[in-house]
């Protein structure tokens, strides 16, 4: 059966295929995290990163798509990385939205908490470069899976807001090992103080951009990249979460929880979907 995604929604929920996808993505991550945590067994230098890429959410998406839809489905999933019809303004939104929110949160931190608090780190350039490269890698290894494969199928069954929350919980579980495995970039950080609120609020932005670009994955990879290159901005964590919460509420209020797409834009998207389906 042809269940390829058209636009930002799939043609069917595909519960079994979704379960297979999450089993690969979450199971492999758990195994990898445990191997690193217990330092067992001894492995070649490149074994861990290669294993992580192959069985990442993106890797799992291509595996399941290849098994269920063949080469045609794999090519269709890959082509979602670039859509010539994507509006350039959404690429800018993807790159700059979180940076603007972080700057705003940094300024609020100075005003409300400590006027002497420095807004920028001293080594800003190196922080931006490292953050951008790490975020780009993470985006490429995750977004074909979370948004390219799972989100369109979730939106067949639930509205955009509910789909965002459900996917946020699952993808959040996938990230837990980054807080407990030695050598991971977030090892030792306080998971409960930061990640759940940050992730669940931020994930509304992912779905909002995904749906308004008709399922474009380049925009999502850029947005994922932007989550990492703003580390040179000093801010209070809870102030930033508050700023993101307000932004998420505004997005839902203006665009609506059903599709996170304004009605006029949604009609245009539906016409594009019908044209692609014909």
Residue ranges and their predicted role:
Residues 141-168, 211-216:
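Membrane-interface helix/loop boundary segments of multi-pass membrane proteins
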Residues 26, 55, 95-96, 128, ...:
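Residue-level signature of the transmembrane alpha-helical core
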Residues 188-249:
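Functionally important transmembrane alpha-helices
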């Amino acid at each position: 059966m042809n269940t390829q995604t058209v636009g930002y929604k799939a043609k069917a929920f595909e519960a079994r295929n979704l379960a297979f996808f999450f089993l690969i993505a979450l199971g492999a991550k758990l195994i990898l995290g445990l191997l690193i945590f217990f330092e067992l067994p001894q492995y070649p230098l490149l074994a861990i990163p290669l294993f992580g890429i192959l069985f990442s959410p993106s890797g799992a998406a291509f595996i399941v798509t290849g098994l269920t839809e063949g080469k045609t489905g794999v090519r269709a999933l890959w082509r979602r990385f670039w859509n010539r019809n994507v509006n350039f303004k959404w690429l800018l939104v993807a790159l700059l939205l979180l940076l603007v929110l972080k700057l705003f949160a940094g300024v609020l931190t100075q005003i409300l908490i400590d006027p002497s608090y420095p807004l920028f780190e001293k080594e800003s350039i190196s922080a931006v470069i490292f953050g951008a490269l790490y975020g780009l890698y993470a985006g490429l290894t995750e977004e074909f899976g979370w948004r390219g494969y799972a989100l369109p199928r979730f939106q067949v069954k639930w509205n955009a807001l509910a789909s965002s929350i459900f996917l946020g919980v699952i993808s959040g579980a996938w990230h837990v090992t980054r807080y407990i495995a030695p050598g991971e970039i977030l090892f030792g950080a306080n998971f409960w103080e930061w990640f759940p609120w940050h992730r669940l609020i931020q994930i509304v932005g992912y779905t909002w951009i995904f749906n308004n670009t008709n399922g474009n994955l380049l925009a999502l990879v850029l947005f994922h990249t932007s989550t990492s290159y703003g580390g040179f901005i000093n801010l209070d964590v809870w102030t930033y979460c508050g700023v993101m919460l307000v932004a998420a509420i505004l997005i839902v209020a203006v665009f609506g929880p059903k599709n996170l797409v304004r009605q006029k834009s949604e009609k245009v998207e539906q016409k594009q979907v019908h044209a692609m389906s014909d």
